[in-house]
Every structure is written in structure tokens, then in C-alpha cells.
């Protein structure tokens, strides 16, 4: 731990030293001969002897400037040079740092026949709620797709799953030339569109894409827009890749894109077995917002192969895959403001996983341990189709989305747990169909009416077979048997419909909404034993379920929007009457629940200044459980966990409060934000577990329970013009308090996690780029009734160097170092290194790239994971070294 603190302290001192190295300032004003201020004049601080530029800036709107002077620099060794278009350049000596150095420039008399202005300094342009980054200011020759550039933009961060955030707020969409081709599956664009086809990246704050509602209904969404270059709009764009390597690896990417005003398309075929998980490209980054909008609790997958954990590594470090993805995305502007869009993909993969894990559960006076080794194979086939018709006019909006999803997944597992050998086959085939219709129309009175209708059907038949039989004493009265078969399915019909009426005014927009929703479900499950003579019977009378469920809801809502320029606010006051009926004749279960709820929500955004704002959020929400909270028969969710319910339906009161401040100074490319969040959940029941060395039984008891969560996080990003570097940092502190019952003991847990992040991206010269990122994570968990506690420290460092000696040759070297410390265990240290060389064959307009991934050939990885009183020690098999030769060309 001391070593970690020294490393963190060294990082902190490095940051401070960069700040302290500019300990003095010189300031002044720049005016013309009449005394009028000259904005945007270039002010250079130079060494009087060598004429080298020490620092520079530009004047603000009042003609003033401030220059940072390096520490321990004598004033008489410096001069200030001021340049402005149409005026003569003027140079002055500095007598001292206390007195201002003012300039009065005289206009040039001679006519300039030709003026060429070169400025390599990145500039952000602001216009209203839109901030514009010029791609060429931040790109480098090694950047192949636009996602490579977005990662380096000041104020923007990209998570490991591709989620983009601007000043710590996730973006809602990424538009392409102003059109929404992909909804929230924007990783398709960021991982495919060539960076050379994009002229600018725009950040749109307070994005309200529905024209009827603009300046009437508050939106605090943030979206990105990719501005396409003119020449890229005139032709088909494509970056093709064909690669092969050792041991038996391949990587193929064939794509064709079009970005015309009336037609946009991203269509491609990808396949690889190099650890590149193509499923990351079709991730929906805002699925939580979608589920909140449709207000439907989609049943989660119930069964699994075991408590598998994912290593905290980059995917290509540990993934054994054989992936293929056909992805088709096409948008046609039928006429002005009328669009037809088709998004479809088919994904096939075969993934292998070898890992071993020891799970330690710390109980009062006892410790339970599980040991398991698994050799897994997953074979998903995923189909997705979406048709969207959109009319988006000033007075009329129509949006209809037809969605169909089907997945056929078969998973195989060879499991060795303690003294048992088990083969598992798990089949999971979810099917989803839905149609979402939304109509908004502005009347002659300027009032707005809205009609909404959503209907869906969902089913997910699950089947898991475990063989040979194990735990005979529990499942078959001490008689040996052949197989244990668990089946589960929860088919669901759902519809949600409402009418809304909005009354806009200069100050407040009033909205009134009323509607209803109906959910109809049936949960069926059975745990069957296949005897050695192939006869089949239930494991017991309490391992079967047939639950019928109906939830009906009627609601009315009043909302008030203040869409001002300084103060934006939304107050929503919904009233809900819902009735839930559920029954299961197998357990003489027949219950009804009627509740009337009031769930107020308040959102406030106050513009402190032109670029800075304060946000407030409060949400009180009553939540009622789902059909998965009421089944009485046991379900074997994995090979060693039986779960059932004995309490009434779960009811929760969820309170969420948050406050945040966002700072931006576009002129100097400086961004920072800080947010605090508190979440309190009170429930009418509590989870209880009986844990033994052979099995874990879970059940829900009717006992009042609450959880509390506090989160504090901050981010900072600054571009240094002098160092040509984007510096970024982040910090997060989170505390979670919860209560569980384990082996009849009431255990309150407190888990605290802290994260510190520091990164830099430097353009050393036109030939050399360097990036560095360090992430320190600390997790500790303990129970008030037990003195024992766990504490884990993890440090990840990543560095990359790019070197382009000539235009046609590029070299890249990168590395990752993982360090984990947990008291009582040896330190875990891993280092991964990659290298590549790219050669441009100008005659063929083709690139050849030779790469070596994990060239140090690290083939195992150990990791520690902590949750409440459960510690998991896992060991994974890695693919090892991959050598790949790629042929890349454009069409």
C-alpha cells in the first residue's frame, strides 16, 4: 500500500510541478491607434536572445491578455510580440512583471496581394449550445477511425464499452451529418467511419431533436454530430482490411459507407479470431433510458452456468473468439423532414473460456469456500431488425419503430467443482417483438397534442442440463441419477398507451398526460431428475412453478417546463393507480395488490455564465416487484444455487438526489465537472441465504430493509498549447450500505470504493505521439458484526508511443501494466506489450501492417474481486502472442 501511495504521490507532484512551473504572469491590453480594443490578436512571449516562443495567447473580446511566464525567468530576458491581421507587428521589452505591457497597433497602408495564415493551435468554436471541434486539430496519422480521434478531444471521455461522455455526462446519440442513423448504437459509427471523412465533431447541449418541442420542452441531453467533408459526401467511402497471422488467426473488415444528404449508410462484414469482440459495436448505450420510456420490466435471464466473473482486462487480452458480424444500416430521406431507416444485423460467434475460481464467503464464526474449474464454449447466433419511419416537421412529428430480436445461444461447460465433475449444456433463446408509435402535432392555437402507443411480446425459454447427477442427497433422495434438467420461461405481453396535451407559453409549457398500461405474464419452471433408466420426475414437489401475473396501470400526469436560456427546469407530478394479480395453484397462491402512488420528479439547470451551469435533480419513485419476486417453487439458477420466495410482493420507495456543476472555457480548452449523488431505497423484504459447502439456498423474507448509496465524482480536462498535450483526470468515491441475512445472521455491509484516473495525450512533434493513462482503484468491504474486512488495491498503467519517421512509415509500441494487492495474498503483477509497423505503398494506395499483440506471450492472468463479504480469486487462460499481417486499402 505504501508503494501505491508513493506512486500516486509522484503522479500528484508531477501535475503540481506542471502548474508551479508557470509561477509568474505578464498582462496588458492591445488597442488600435484610436484606442479601440483589438480582440483575437496573437500575443507571443519570446526569448530576447534566441527569439524562441516561450508562451502565447490571444486577446479576449476586450483586447486584454494574460501570459504565463516560466518560473525563475528574468523579465529583462523576454520580449512580447503582438500580431493582428491588418496591423503592423509590434515588439516590446519587459521591464518587470508588476507593470502591464500595453500595445497600440497602427494599421498597415500597403495592400497585401496574398495572405496565407497558418495556425496549428487547436481552436474550439461555440455557437449557442453547440461546441465544435475541428478533427484535423486533434488527429494524427495513426488514427484510422473517428473513434480514435474522439478519445483525444478535451472534455470528452470514452469508456471501455464505447460509451461517450461530454464533461462527465453520457451522450444520447451520435448524429451523422445531422441525421440519426444509429440511435444509441453509435459504436457502429465510431468504430467504422474513417477519421479522414469527418471534418468536425460537434457537441450539442440541451439537444431537443423533435422540432415541435424545441424551445417548449426542456431537454438536458447531450448529443454529438459528425460533420462529413464535402468530398466524402460525393462517393462511396470504405476502409477494407484483410489480415492473417499466427497461430491460425484472421481479421477481415469489408465495409461500404455513403453520407449523402438524402441517403446515409454504414454497411459492413467483419470477422476475426483475434479477440476483437464485434458485439461491442452493437451495444445500446442508453438502454436504461429506453426501458424507462416504455415503462416495462423485461424479465432478466434466470439461469447461468455459474458465478463466472469477467477479468478486468482489455477484451482482446483474454477473449478466445471466432466472430462474424453482418451489419446493415441505411437511412433514406424520402423528402424534406421525412425519413425511412432500416437497421439490421446478424452476429455469430464461438467463444472459449478456461478459468478456475475460489470463492470465499466470510460469515460470523465461519468461512465457506467453493473451488471450481470451468472449460466453457459459447455459441450465440443473434438476429436484430429495426424499421423506423420518421416525420420531423416544425408543426408535426411522427415516429414509428418496428423492432424484432431473436437470439439462439447454446453454451457448454465442463465443470470441476470440489469433488464433482459436471457437464452442462445451457440453451437460451430470447425472442422480442415490439412496435412503438409516437405522434405529436402543433395546433393552430399553438397548443400541442401527442398520442403514444407501445406493444410488445417477449419470451425467453431457458433450458440447462447438468450431467452426471450430483448432490444426490439433495436432489434424488441419495439415489444416483443421470441428469438434472432445469427449465424456465416467462412469456410476456405488454402495452402502454397515452394521450398528452401541451400548452406552450413564453414562460412555461404545461403538459397534461393520461394513459394506461397492461402487462400479462406466465412464469413456468421445473427442476427434473432424469434417472439412470431414463425415467423423468421432479426433484421435489417444491421445484416447479406456474405463476400467472397481470399488472394493470392507469396514470395521469402534470408537467411544467421552463425552457429558458438562463434557467431551465422541469417539474413532473405523476399519479398512478395500479393493480397486480398473481396466482399459482400449485402453492394455493392467489393474491392481489392495489396501490396509488405519487412519484414527483424535479430537474433544474441554471446557467451560471455563458459556458458554466449548475444542475439539480430529485426523484421520488415507488417501485413494485416483478413476477420473479413471487414464485414459491425453487429454481436452480446455477449448479449450486437454489432460489425461491416466501414473502409478499416487493415494494420499494426509491429517493434519488443529485447536484452537479459543469465548467467550460472553450477558448482555452479547459473543462471540469463535479457531481454528488445520494440514493436511498426502502423495501418491505430482505434476501436471506443459507450457505453450505455443497449448496447455497436463497429465499426472500418479509423483513423491512433499506440500502444507502453515496457517490461523489469529478472530472477535469485541459489542453496545454505549450506542451501540445491533453491532460485529463477523474476521481470517484462511492459508499454502499446494505443488509443481508446469511445463515440466520443479520449482516449489515459497508462497501467503499475509490477511483483515481490521470491521463495525457501528447503530440511531441509531427512525427511522434505519446499517451499515458493511470487508474488506481481501491475497494474495501466489512460488516459491523465482524471485525474481519477485505481491502483490494489495483493500479493499471497504459502507455503508447507512435513514431512516423516518414509519411509512408508508421511505428507503434504500447504496453499495459496491471498491479493488484490484497492483504494476506502475494502481489499480482502483469505486463502486456504490443507493437506494429505500417508501410504505405503509394502506387497501390494500400497499407501493409505487421502487428504483434501480447508479444511477451503472457498466457495466464489472476485477479481478485470483492463484493460485500464475498471474495473471488480467479485465474484465466489467455490467448498469448498473436502475429498478424494486414492489407488495408480504401475504396
Predicted features and spans:
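Outer membrane beta-barrel strand-and-loop segments of large Gram-negative receptors
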Residues: 538-545, 555, 644, 650, ...
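Conserved C-terminal beta-signal and adjacent last beta-strands/turns
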Residues: 757-776, 790-891
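Outer-membrane beta-barrel translocator domains and adjoining extracellular loop/strand segments
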Residues: 94, 214-215, 279-284, 352-368, ...
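Outer-membrane beta-barrel transmembrane domain signature of Gram-negative proteins
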Residues: 374-382, 386, 440-442, 482-570, ...
